[in-house]
Amino acid sequence: MKKFLFAAVMLFSAAFATDLQSENLASLKAQCQSGDAAKCAVLGDAYYEEYIASGDEEVRKLSAAAFKEACDKGDGEGCAGLGLSYIDEGDAAASEKLLEKTCDELKTATACYNLGFFKIDGHGGFRQDVKGAMKYYEKACDLGYAAGCEELGGIYNVGEADVKADENQALKYYEKSCALGGKDGCDAVKLIKGGK
């Protein structure tokens, strides 16, 4: 299960890379304990990265607890992280419910993206649902998350399930990804335009 989650976690982690480099764990713990929901989410992410590297179940539980504290305080990134934690616990239904709420109500792009990721191929115990995945990738893209745009570009570029390949649609999403700073989107634009 950890291998499936690794890609989602790395995208989730990118949102916090600066904080993780500039603050130590003790500082994050103190800030979380003082009520800073965003720092609780960063703390959860730091623990989750350690869990991915070590496989230590106690560290995973610390991660889930920090994410839950952040989520309980209304932090969307904390809720997105808690949704990933539910998958580790084997509860895809709870994960899907929380990620949907976090995406739809809190407008958290990482939650939208993760829903797309899990639905596209049925990762993490989710039911495969290409149209559902596209819906959530679209929401992530609309919220300014370049990877969501890239995924839509990829789906339209090659076609997926009952979605026909459409180079114009692919180009539209790749260009949006590129405008949002997505290197893969920029590379895809060059490939498509170079082929014309």
Name the predicted role of every residue range.
Residues 4-13:
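Sec-dependent N-terminal signal peptides
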Residues 16-51:
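N-terminal leader/linker segments that initiate helical-solenoid repeat arrays
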